[in-house]
Amino acid sequence: ALANRIIAHEGVLDGFGHVSMRHPTDPGRYLLARSRSPELIEPADIFEFTLDSEPVAAKGVTLYGERVIHGCIYQARPDVNAVCHHHSPSVLPFCITGIELVPVFHMGAVLGTAAPFWDSRDEFGDTNMLVVKPEEGQSLAKALGAHWMVLMRRHGATLVGTTLRELVFRTVYSHANAEIQLRSMLLGKIGPLSRGEAERTGPHQLQPRPMARAWEYWTTRLEKSGEMPKSGRGGKSRAAKSRAGNKTARTRTTTRPRAKR
């Protein structure tokens, strides 16, 4: 819930888009919210899904149609533990023109040396532009390959991370990089980071200290705006409540009542 709200508050997500993370104790499942605007997500909105994107327990709840994006990427990339799909207005011009999005300042190096493109037309012809079929999700995951970001022609972008905080960091700063690249192109020819600079700078930015500093900044901004999810005030997700309930049930079953004296 917090990651959704941070990315929305920083102007990347709007009423649409979604963020997920691989289940912390079961790599064969992932956690994703029900179909709701990211800035409104609460812990109780989070549900578990199999890697085939089937809900584990979400009867009567409207779900994201594009959840196959997440499941297919988790299947293809065991190293990935968090995924974000968005339609950032700063990134969309690159998705529309086909101009390469490259790191143009040091913080933008977290997107990699360049983001590859995926075009649904290449395999599926004219569609409704939504990635809702398993074969579409698999095709997108293939285009992502070993990269950290893939641009979806005429649609948006999908990013991944090895942790949720890394994903948030990469999502926010690739959005900023796109805005800076757009502005720079208006002035003239851009001078992006070299491959060597990007390969050295990206991992440096993703060290614990820089990420902790950024996370503190984002959460403080969110708190000051009064938009912190209930988890910031002690709330629990449905997945956490379910695990707690199962644990309580097991305890009640296995613990024998004491005899009265």
Residue ranges and their predicted role:
Residues 1-261:
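Glycine-rich flexible loops
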